[in-house]
Amino acid sequence: FLDKVKTYMNEQVEKAVPIYKRSVDTHEARERFRLHGMTDKDRLFRYRRVSRVNLYSLGDFEDYYYGFMTYDTSYLKYFGLYLYDNGFILQMPEKKAPETVPAANLSPKVFQVQRESERWGEQMGISTVADLNERITKGNIQQMMLIAEALQEQKIAKIAEQIAEKKTVKFVLIAGPSSSGKTTFCNRLSIQLSAHGLTPHPISLDNYYVNRVDTPRDENGEYDFECLEALDIDLLNQDMTKLLNGERVELPYFNFKTGKREYKGNFIQMKETDVLVLEGIHGLNEKLTWSLPAESKFRIYISALTQINVDEHNRIPTTDGRLIRRMVRDSRTRATSAKETIAMWPSVRRGEDRNIFPNQEKADVMFNSALVYELSVLKLYAEPLLFQIEEGEPEYQEAKRLLKFLDYFVGVPIEDIP
């Protein structure tokens, strides 16, 4: 079957079938969606604050797509089709090599946690943005929020139970990309570990940064805080080994203002029920904790995989959700503007591709921190930040794209969160 699909796609590429774009008013677009049986799009545009919609057609097929479309099918000649699970993967080139189709990056554990999150969404009756918007406007969003939180808490409780059952585990290593929710998860897991009779000690790996003057620099001469060598690996292993052997250790504190390591009398000595919960982007990299016995470590990977789609034909990129999370967080806790966050995001993403994603399948357990309703909450905080970016600034187009994306969602005031 897949060979026939690929043959047909290649035939369409050879024919260079044009893709037409036309702008229609929203009322007409909704009528056409209903005509085509696309009720998800009809419901979606009930909440869009736009007067016109761009529709695209290929032959007799007409649809709406979030993002830009090419002129004709001849531009789509580079692709790969691979059977996977109960479906298939459509593999496209990456921006850095537009004429090369990379091998399919199969990540079974990531795929399974995505499927789990989709099941949670189906359990709540929410699989698209339209489903979410309808729940919000009908006023029964709070129950759905409580269910979403409860499902996550059940998962965290099960992870804590797994750790408690492994009597040899002394180090819980938590890793994940930027704004995936590592710190929040670390705190929630610590509560569940306490409920199992353990004494958790949350430790941020950021406190093991080398002094700023010793931080490696990237290809542009800028400090590379996201490479493994930005951490004092020798000191970390020395401290953790001493703790494992029952010695009393003073843990460091990294002062981000001075860029130097400090000691503030934070002493720890591990007893039988003590567990160290280490959180940082390199937590799953074996080079980070090379001296610690394998049986003493339990690895957890945190992702933020959005479990709903814009509609049946348009997905929500996971990176968009994390970027919006980071924008709001940086503004509230680090006095960083949305403009600055957007400007540094490509560098953050490069660091993730290099240092984090290659290690994700090493996890003993994966946890998806994304909540089905979170973009509706973040919308009210992110939009004012994005509107501060002026036309003509390098980050304006990205800000405009994110504003368009957030416009799909009906906002939820913070006071409505249980």
Q: For each predicted feature, which ranges?
A:
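Conserved glycine(s) of the Walker
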Residues: G181
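Post-Walker A helix-loop "phosphate-sensing" segment adjacent to the P-loop in P-loop NTPases
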Residues: I191-H201
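Conserved NTP phosphate-binding and transfer environment spanning the P-loop NTPase/kinase superfamily
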Residues: K167, E286-P418
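Auxiliary tRNA-acceptor-end handling modules of aminoacyl-tRNA synthetases
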Residues: F1-Q154, I159, K166
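Conserved nucleotide-sensing/catalytic segment adjacent to the nucleotide-binding pocket
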Residues: H201-I203, V210-T258, V275
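Glycine-rich phosphate-binding loop used to anchor ATP phosphates in small-molecule kinases
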Residues: N237-E295, I342-N359
